[in-house]
Amino acid sequence: MARPVKVCELAHHLNIPIWEVLLPCNFCTGFLTYQELLEFDYKDFNLLWKDGFVFGCCAACAYRSAYHEFTNYHQEIVVGIEIEGRAAANIAEIVVRCLICLKRLDLLEKLDICAQHREFHRVRNRWKGVCRHCRVIE
């Protein structure tokens, strides 16, 4: 059987409820809270398997990682729909993650950025924008 890649798959595989999953963070080794377990799947992260052990990423480490990548590996900025030309793909096909929390943006979030002429950033050859949740606190 293939190894689970999502928290809900791991819980199902172990035949336990999600709130009983003890998932260490790959970066700080602290255990993810129940809220972070739910956010992990919502943000479309994948579990990391090392030597038969499974790891995730807590919210604090995701924020730190996003900040580190942005400050050290930022490449360019495009405004709104210009992203289609730079990426040579349709907006629906372009993978964009949140610049702040690393959540994978859905189509409505990407279209909203385009409609409001907000910025997309290319960081480490991957596209970033600000998700609806982080835009509220921005």
Curated annotation (Swiss-Prot):
Keywords: Activator, DNA-binding, Early protein, Host cytoplasm, Host nucleus, Host-virus interaction, Inhibition of host innate immune response by virus, Metal-binding, Modulation of host cell apoptosis by virus, Transcription, Transcription regulation, Viral immunoevasion, Zinc, Zinc-finger. Coiled coil: none annotated. GO terms for cellular component: host cell cytoplasm; host cell nucleus. It is found in: Host cytoplasm; Host nucleus. GO terms for molecular function: DNA binding; zinc ion binding. One of its GO terms (biological process) is symbiont-mediated suppression of host innate immune response. It comes from the Viruses. A zinc finger (unnamed) spans 25-61, 98-134. Pfam families: E6 (PF00518). Gene3D superfamilies: E6 early regulatory protein. Forms homodimers. Interacts with ubiquitin-protein ligase UBE3A/E6-AP; this interaction stimulates UBE3A ubiquitin activity. Interacts with host BAK1. Belongs to the papillomaviridae E6 protein family. Plays a major role in the induction and maintenance of cellular transformation. E6 associates with host UBE3A/E6-AP ubiquitin-protein ligase and modulates its activity. Protects host keratinocytes from apoptosis by mediating the degradation of host BAK1. May also inhibit host immune response. This is Protein E6. The lineage of its organism: Viruses, Monodnaviria, Shotokuvirae, Cossaviricota, Papovaviricetes.
